[in-house]
Amino acid sequence: MDLLPVEIKVNVEGDVAAALSALGASGRATTVRHIWFAEDRDGAAEGQVLLLESGVILRFRIGGDPDDLTVKLRPCLREQLVGRFSAPFEAKPFTYKIEQDWSANGRVLAASLVHGHAPGVLSGAVAPGGDPATAVDALEDQFLHACTPSVQLDGLIALGPVRSTKIDDVPLDDMDVDLEAWSAAGLDFLEASIRVKPKDEDDAEKLAERAERKQRKLSEAVQARGVVLSERPENKTQRILTALAEATA
């Protein structure tokens, strides 16, 4: 079985602007987008995030070029990913990725199908009264039915917007780190992430050892600049979606 890239994430607590400055992001090019997540309407009315709890994320990103809709399974099992979804592929306007997702609180597998769209095409699906499911096309629907057939996209509501500010490839020691700040529902988060790609000489053990070293280096580099890492068990998607659902209830 092919080795998979590892995305390593650390979350930051406290003053996001101060953390960005301490990590060297000031003056660098930024990408600002607005993000919506689709959730079960009835569940959100009770402050619940049923789609997320079933391991499915539907994320709309608007304001980039292109805009995009991502259908992600996280966590998932490799055995779930069947047929054409058993291996990564790119077929414009689609990109399909399978990655290991590591954080301080665990390691999971994630599979995501990203569909790029022209600016403005997705706006109606996330507008008040809109139906996010109308933006899910045949390939994304096939992905869900093949890999998580118990999940139904009926009665959805768009939760958001979340303001996302992303700064890519910030040099931190000998690493190029992506920084992304999220702001919504009275919450502000910052995530720092790197990717570790398999090398030709890697086996599973070598890749894991290299990723573990990188994970330690990332945490140490962030903390060495006076930035406090989060000790909360939830990732940023869980925290922000829960807050948005509670605000809807």
Give the residues covered by each predicted segment:
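Phosphate-end processing signature that detects enzymes handling 5′-triphosphorylated RNA
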Residues: 1-249
